[in-house]
Amino acid sequence: MASISSSVATVSRTAPAQANMVAPFTGLKSNAAFPTTKKANDFSTLPSNGGRVQCMKVWPPLGLKKYETLSYLPPLTETQLAKEVDYLLRKKWVPCLEFELEHGFVYRENARSPGYYDGRYWTMWKLPMFGCTDSAQVMKELAECKKEYPQAWIRIIGFDNVRQVQCIMFIASRPDGY
C-alpha cells in the first residue's frame, strides 16, 4: 500500500514596522483658540402660543374616520371642489375619479405590513381625464358617479403623468352617515 503525503510550505515575510505607518494629521487647532460666548438659559425669547394651547385639539379617534388629503375639514362644497380641481389642472396634473363601495377608509385586507401602503384598491370611474382643461368636466363626471353609486366614497386624484406619481387625492363624496 502506498501512502501519499503532502506538505504545505508557509512563507512569512517580515516588513519593517515603520514603512506602512502614516504620520498623524496635525493641521487642526484646538477649540481653545476660538472665542466662545456662553449664553444664559433664557426661555423668555422662545416662540410661544401662550394661552391658545387650551384651544388646540387633536383628531378625535372615535366617530370621525380619516380618509385622504383634506379629510380633517368638513365636506367640501361644489364650489370648493371645483377650486381644488382648478388647482390640480393648473399644476398640469391629470384628474381621475375613483370610488369604493365598502371601505372608504384605511384598512388592511391585501397587505398586513405597516407603512405607507394601506391595503386598499379603489375602482376607477372611467379613464383618467387626459386633456381635461376645465373643472366643470370633472364636476360633471363626479355628478354621474354619484348618480350611479349614491352610497360610495368617491375621490378625485391628481396624477402627474410626467413623473408618473399621484400628487393629490381628496374625498369628493361620502355615503350618508360618514
From Swiss-Prot:
Q: In terms of domain of life, where is this protein from?
A: Eukaryota
InterPro entries per UniProt: RuBisCO_ssu (IPR024681), RuBisCO_ssu_dom (IPR000894), RuBisCO_ssu_N (IPR024680), RuBisCO_ssu_sf (IPR036385)
Give the residue range annotated as the organelle targeting sequence. Answer: 1-54
- Where does the protein end up? Plastid, Chloroplast
Chief location category: plastid
* Gene Ontology cellular component terms for the protein in this record: chloroplast
Q: Cite the CDD domains for this sequence.
A: RuBisCO_small
Keywords, A to Z?
A: Calvin cycle, Carbon dioxide fixation, Chloroplast, Photorespiration, Photosynthesis, Plastid, Transit peptide
One Pfam match, given by its short name, reads RuBisCO_small
The yes or no answer to whether the keyword Zinc is present is no
Q: Which SMART domains match?
A: RuBisCO_small
Q: Tell me, how does this one assemble?
A: Heterohexadecamer of 8 large and 8 small subunits.
Q: Which family does it belong to?
A: Belongs to the RuBisCO small chain family.
> Beyond the main fields, what else does the record say?
The basic functional RuBisCO is composed of a large chain homodimer in a 'head-to-tail' conformation. In form I RuBisCO this homodimer is arranged in a barrel-like tetramer with the small subunits forming a tetrameric 'cap' on each end of the 'barrel'.
User: What is the recorded name of this protein?
Assistant: Ribulose bisphosphate carboxylase small subunit, chloroplastic
Q: Which organism is it from?
A: Helianthus annuus (Common sunflower)
